[in-house]
Amino acid sequence: MQQLQNIIETAFERRAEITPANADTVTREAVNQVIALLDSGALRVAEKIDGQWVTHQWLKKAVLLSFRINDNQVIEGAESRYFDKVPMKFANYDAARFQKEGFRVVPPAAVRQGAFIARNTVLMPSYVNIGAYVDEGTMVDTWATVGSCAQIGKNVHLSGGVGIGGVLEPLQANPTIIEDNCFIGARSEVVEGVIVEEGSVISMGVYIGQSTRIYDRETGEIHYGRVPAGSVVVSGNLPSKDGKYSLYCAVIVKKVDAKTRGKVGINELLRTID
């Protein structure tokens, strides 16, 4: 694996010079191998090690290099044709392969090659970009988008129209991460490498980036870039220091543990916020 990483790191330093026409065989094979490993879930761009999320930057670099070494090509679809550098994940799947991997894909869901989809996942008409990791038992609902290299945990529900930000455009240092057992409400956006920790519930229409203030109304504490575990979050506003205006924020209205979350439905958690 170290040899593979070294090839990627070296090639990335001269990425501006690389084109589909001049990419050498060693680089091309290394990049394709990494994409295949990401696609199978054997590697992932970020993983939790000793309780902390660690981003493997060289894997992200391999994803970026894949755009340098591959030319656009015609991609056949059910209703149309496409022209892109990245093949679709399911292009060569047959019924036996789908059954073996154990997830459902509802048309016209689109998943790029290099994204991993775990067992018991349901993809409604949605989009999952290259390098993303979607873990077991997760629902990606209609028109939800999982951005490049985003990490989605087990038993997560991404509601209709949710946007989970990617790292490639604009280029971000770390992927957006949604940990296990989270619920992200309809039309919410979580971007710029924000981490939503385990068991959190994000209400409909909440927008969280690195500069968004995440205000805990119980403690008065303000978080940036991280939603603490077990938070129930709604959109809100905080007043300016001079009191003349207010600016958008996300508000943690309560905290719940796994036991409470198991007994009380998501809708009930969001309705009883007073």
Curated annotation (Swiss-Prot):
PROSITE patterns: HEXAPEP_TRANSFERASES
Catalyzed reaction equations: (S)-2,3,4,5-tetrahydrodipicolinate + succinyl-CoA + H2O = (S)-2-succinylamino-6-oxoheptanedioate + CoA
Disulfide bond keyword on record: no
InterPro entries: DapD_Trfase_Hexpep_rpt_fam (IPR005664), Hexapep (IPR001451), Hexapep_transf_CS (IPR018357), THP_succinylTrfase_dom1 (IPR023180), THP_succinylTrfase_N_sf (IPR037133), Trimer_LpxA-like_sf (IPR011004)
Pfam families: Hexapep_2 (PF14602), THDPS_N_2 (PF14805)
Entry keywords, A to Z: Acyltransferase, Amino-acid biosynthesis, Cytoplasm, Diaminopimelate biosynthesis, Lysine biosynthesis, Repeat, Transferase
Secreted found in the keyword field: no
GO cellular component: cytoplasm
Location within or outside the cell: Cytoplasm
Enzyme class, spelled out: transferase
Spans through the membrane: none
Disulphide-bonded residues: none
SUPFAM superfamilies, sorted: Trimeric LpxA-like enzymes
MF-aspect GO terms: 2,3,4,5-tetrahydropyridine-2,6-dicarboxylate N-succinyltransferase activity; nucleotidyltransferase activity
Protein origin, superkingdom: Bacteria
One GO-annotated biological process of the protein: lysine biosynthetic process via diaminopimelate
Pathway connected to this protein: Amino-acid biosynthesis; L-lysine biosynthesis via DAP pathway; LL-2,6-diaminopimelate from (S)-tetrahydrodipicolinate (succinylase route): step 1/3
Record EC number: 2.3.1.117
Similarity section: Belongs to the transferase hexapeptide repeat family.
NCBIfam families: dapD, PRK11830.1
Name of the protein described by the UniProt record: 2,3,4,5-tetrahydropyridine-2,6-dicarboxylate N-succinyltransferase
Species the sequence originates in: Escherichia coli (strain SMS-3-5 / SECEC)
